[in-house]
A protein has these predicted regions:
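Feature captures outer-membrane beta-barrel proteins of Gram-negative bacteria and organelles
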Residues: 244-252
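Transmembrane beta-strand segments that form the barrel wall of outer-membrane beta-barrel proteins
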Residues: 224-233, 273-275
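Long hydrophobic segments that form regular secondary structure
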Residues: 91, 95-96, 214, 317, ...
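Solvent-exposed loop/turn segments connecting transmembrane beta-strands
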Residues: 234-240
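Structured alpha-helical segments in the cores of large, soluble enzyme domains
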Residues: 208-218
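Surface-exposed loop/interface segments of Gram-negative outer-membrane beta-barrel transport/assembly proteins
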Residues: 2-83, 101-208, 235, 254-321, ...
């Protein structure tokens, strides 16, 4: 929406809710429902004559692996997923040809799941189970840019932009599994006799970037551009957070030259060259840190142990690439 002649503001928000029923596991194993279905022979009927599911218990299931449909019914996994995505922006033009824009985005997700394993189902060996989990994810992003463009003598076109971007990501949750439930109706956590597994993962990272770009073209014939940026990531060592990257490019639009006007069958002809560096930070969030983990027992006492050796020298992966291209067009669309 236009607040006044030099300011525009806007927002966009989306909310979704899903309920998903699925099998408990997708591993490549005969007991996993999805995998087991690939090994079913055509004459293995998953249903009895009365329409109910064929079971190993009464011998109605003739397959050598589990009946995938019966497995899913007796080991149900339900998920509830909430998703909120919202963006707000403000764009100002305080003077002619200058545009200043600020945008804030929030991406939030909440997922809960409930898994049950019914003890009456023979493949479960009269041993029930229950698992509950809950996870939250919040990703915040802010982008600020200032763009200035102008022309000189109707043939020199300039476009300059500087900006900053920040990302803050946080994820946390918990998961608890208990075993030993003896009744199909009471397959909740508190009905189990033992807690077989549990966890409460937390992970987060942040990025901060500053960048600039310049573009110039002369009479739509000669083009030049450059860009520089500095990126900081929490995934690297204390003295290795930052990486600097750049690129330059040139392009000659041959089709605009007078000596090319006679070639009517050639609708486009451009020669381009660019060179520069780019960075990659795709590693685990805490790869650079020495880590310890709990859950170990020493003489029946809770203990911790080293789970990862740190490396403070981890830094950005940098790639330098150069490209030369010839663009030709033969059809005028």
């Amino acid at each position: 929406a236009k607040a006044n002649k030099w300011l525009k503001i806007g927002t966009n928000t989306m909310f979704t809710y899903q309920e998903v029923e699925q099998s408990d596991d997708g591993e490549y194993a005969l007991w996993a429902p999805i995998s087991a279905s690939f090994f079913m022979l055509p004459y293995w009927n998953p249903y009895k004559e009365d329409g109910s599911l064929a079971l190993q218990d009464d011998g109605s299931w003739k397959g050598t692996t589990e009946n995938p449909l019966a497995w899913m019914e007796n080991n149900p996994l339900s998920n509830k997923k909430y998703k909120l995505l919202s963006t707000f922006y403000a764009e100002a033009t305080p003077i002619k040809n200058l545009t200043i824009r600020s945008q804030l985005s929030a991406d939030y997700g909440h997922t809960t799941s409930f898994y049950r394993s019914f003890p009456s189902y023979k493949p479960n060996n009269n041993y029930g189970g229950a698992q509950r989990s809950s996870y939250d994810m919040l990703n915040l992003m802010i982008t600020n840019t200032a763009n200035y463009r102008f022309m000189l003598n109707d043939v020199h076109s300039f476009n300059f932009m500087v900006g900053q971007e920040g990302v803050d990501y946080h994820y946390e949750g918990f998961q608890v599994t208990t075993r030993g439930q003896t009744n199909d109706i009471l397959t909740n956590l508190s009905s189990g006799s033992t807690a077989s597994s549990w966890g409460d993962p937390v992970t987060e990272y942040s990025f901060l970037s500053f960048f600039g770009r310049g573009e110039y073209n002369y009479d739509d014939r000669y083009y030049a551009d450059f860009s520089v940026r500095g990126d900081g990531s929490s995934r690297f060592g204390t003295d290795k957070h930052w990486g600097a990257f750049w690129s330059v490019g040139f392009m000659w639009n041959l089709r605009k030259e007078k000596f090319m006007q006679k070639y009517k069958w050639l609708t486009n002809a451009q020669i381009a060259i660019n060179t520069g560096t780019s960075g990659n930070s795709s590693i685990n969030n805490y790869e650079h840190l020495a880590l310890v983990s709990g859950g170990y027992k020493y003489n029946n006492e809770s203990g911790i142990a080293i789970s990862q050796l740190g490396n403070e020298e981890l830094s950005w992966e940098s790639t330098w690439a150069t490209n030369v291209a010839l663009h030709l067009g033969f059809i005028d669309r």
